[in-house]
Amino acid sequence: PERFEAGTPNIIGVCSLLSSIKVIKSIGFDKIELLEENLKKTLLDGLKGMPDIITYGDSNYKNRIGVVVFNVKDIHHDVISERLANFRGISIRNGTFCAHPYVRRLLNLKDEEFSKYAYSNKPRPGMLRVSLGLYNTKEEIEEFLNTLELVKEKDFRL
């Protein structure tokens, strides 16, 4: 099977999978689902309450998973991501998330519009992504939203 294996097998990942499953089962899927639903609602309601935020995806939080993508009007995603990280140590993903065709579609960009950035020095189009997990709390979501309010101001300085 060597020719079908790309790189070193993820032995640690395989070993830790069983432990992860045990933890999830001990907590209970119903509790995890309820937690994620509450966190999604808090996050989406907070983002929707900011007029300069553009969210992407289904507007009904019950039809979503714990991943929320958005942009801040008139501020590049790199800038917001960097400000969050440098100001409060909040790390979120930004860019196209290895899903270029989908992001391009959500941003309503044609292939030729998007490809002109490939060999240019212009900032590339993309989005900001918050991923919620079992370990997140409502307080962390509120801290994120409060910090986002600060760092999205055009005159924000560290």
Where are these regions (language model features)?
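Pyridoxal 5′-phosphate
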Residues: P1-L158
